[in-house]
Amino acid sequence: MEFDHEIHPTAIIHPNAKLAENIKIGAYSIIGKFVELGEGTEIGNHVSITGHTKIGKSNKIFHSSSIGEQPQDMKYKDQETCLEIGDRNTIREFCTINTGTVEGNKKTLIGNDNWIMAYVHIAHDCIVKNNIVIANNATLAGHVEIDNYVVLGGFTAIHQFCKIGEHAITMGGTLLSQDVLPYVRAVSRGGMAFPNGINSEGLRRRGFTSEAIN
C-alpha cells in the first residue's frame, strides 16, 4: 500500500522500516530496519531512530535526537530489547532515549502526551507514563519510573530505580537518589533532595480544589 509521506531526499529509510500514513521525515535523518512509525508522526532533521523501536501516532521529534540506541549498560550483550513510545509526544532537540535490557523486561516505555525538552536523557528500562513534562537537560538513569502528571525541572538528575509519584514536581537542579511521594514538591539542598511541601500550584492547574489540596 502506498502512503502519502513527506520525506526529504537525503533521509535514509531502511526498506524494512514500517511507516504509517502521513509521515514527515527531515533532512539527513536515519530510520532503522526494525523501526515502526505511527500515523502523523513528524521527524526533524538529523534524527537517528534505530533498534527495535515502535513510535505511535502524532509524535514530533526534533532535530539531532537519538532514539532507540543500545542501552548504556556494561551488562548489555547485544540482546534484542526494545523501546516503545506512545502517541502525541513532543521530543525536542538532542534528546537520547535508549532501549531496555534483559534485566528490565527488555523494554523502555514512554506513554502519551509527554513534553520532553532539549538534551534530556532517558536511560534503559525507564517507564515514563502520561502527561509528563521533563525540562531541559534532565537525566533519568536506568529503571526509573515517572508517574502521570509529573514535572521534572531542568537539570534534574534521578538515580537508577527511583520512582516519582503522580503530580509530583522537582525544582531545577534537583538530585534524586530516593523515591518521591505523589503530590510532593522536591528540592535539592547540599546535594541531596528533600520534600518541600505539596505541589499546590500544579494541582490547582489540574483542577484540584483547595479542599482537596488541603
Label each residue range with its predicted role.
Residues 1-6, 12, 18, 42-130, ...:
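Glycine-rich hexapeptide-repeat left-handed beta-helix
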Residues 26:
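Basic, Lys/Arg-rich alpha-helical nucleic-acid-recognition elements, primarily the DNA-binding modules
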